[in-house]
């Protein structure tokens, strides 16, 4: 009895090891910050294409015709550095988001995967991978949503100078919305975000870990193979969850506005479908696929940084 109780206590300590948890935060956060900065211009193009129909700054005749049109007009109309508008907020938001996703993903995995044999219980093992990814994404979203909201609003602010800008920065955006709409204004679109993030993270983490777990030697997987797997996973996950992302960002655009275009999430889905058609749900999706390269780099860099920090990569990536 004493041996069993000591084993349970030691397993609990291992489950909440602060050193391992901190290393997870560092590895995921650094990888995320680097990749997001690299693809920031594409990120902004994607946001503008998604929400321009709901933006009061962009008149119908001035809307972007597509990704290339947007890429050309941004520096011409707003200046070259505006490609990175909202990037600082994105890095600040993305560091804890991705770090918490990865850190909690491994902790949730230890909870879900306990006693599961990959060889004998493959589908249970696969579902556990999906559940750990979805739970990690939903948990982190609850914490950082106001930063995600502010990043979106800053990224789609198309004014050229301070006098034409809706917000002057991250702090100004949060304060203005909180003052006009209260805390709930910073969580506009939160419900559909949770739905989308669970779909995205479940496939993003679950599929990546599952595919890597099927490889003969997960720890010795070549960089190129890991990158290709990650690229396919991020692309498929992004397309699958993209309509949810479009709706949530349209909902975000309503905070601080007296005249609201949508009554709620369902109304937003219906109005986009009726007035703009199915393609509207996927505006900016190609930009999102290109942006997904950054997400693929995050997954691969995360494993490499964990190796550098002497964290057991096999336990987190293979699902063993």
UniProtKB/Swiss-Prot annotation:
Main location: mitochondrion
Example of a GO MF term: ATP:ADP antiporter activity
GO biological process assignments: cell differentiation; male meiosis I; mitochondrial ADP transmembrane transport; mitochondrial ATP transmembrane transport; regulation of mitochondrial membrane permeability; spermatogenesis
Annotated spans, Important for transport activity: 248-253
Annotated ADP binding sites: 93, 105, 248
Mitochondrial intermembrane side: 1-20, 113-122, 213-223, 303-320
Alphabetic keyword roster: Antiport, Cell membrane, Cell projection, Cilium, Differentiation, Flagellum, Membrane, Mitochondrion, Mitochondrion inner membrane, Repeat, Spermatogenesis, Transmembrane, Transmembrane helix, Transport
GO cellular component, as recorded: mitochondrial inner membrane; mitochondrial permeability transition pore complex; mitochondrion; motile cilium; plasma membrane
Compartment(s) where it occurs, according to its Swiss-Prot or TrEMBL record: Mitochondrion inner membrane; Membrane; Cell projection, Cilium, Flagellum membrane
InterPro entries referenced in this protein's UniProt entry, alphabetically: ADT_euk_type (IPR002113), Mit_carrier (IPR002067), Mitochondrial_sb/sol_carrier (IPR018108), Mt_carrier_dom_sf (IPR023395)
Topology in the lipid bilayer: Multi-pass membrane protein
Notes on activation and inhibition: The matrix-open state (m-state) is inhibited by the membrane-permeable bongkrekic acid (BKA). The cytoplasmic-open state (c-state) is inhibited by the membrane-impermeable toxic inhibitor carboxyatractyloside (CATR). Proton transporter activity is inhibited by ADP:ATP antiporter activity.
Phenotype on disruption: Male mice display a significant reduction in testicular size and are sterile, due to impaired spermatogenesis. Males show increased levels of apoptosis within the spermatocyte layer of the seminiferous epithelium, accompanied by the absence of spermatids and spermatozoa within the seminiferous epithelium and lumen respectively. Early meiotic arrest: an accumulation of leptotene spermatocytes, a decrease in pachytene spermatocytes and an absence of diplotene spermatocytes are observed in spermatocytes.
Assembly and binders: Monomer.
Homology family: Belongs to the mitochondrial carrier (TC 2.A.29) family.
Protein purpose: ADP:ATP antiporter that mediates import of ADP into the mitochondrial matrix for ATP synthesis, and export of ATP out to fuel the cell. Cycles between the cytoplasmic-open state (c-state) and the matrix-open state (m-state): operates by the alternating access mechanism with a single substrate-binding site intermittently exposed to either the cytosolic (c-state) or matrix (m-state) side of the inner mitochondrial membrane. Specifically required during spermatogenesis, probably to mediate ADP:ATP exchange in spermatocytes.
Protein name listed in UniProt: ADP/ATP translocase 4
Gene name of the record: Slc25a31
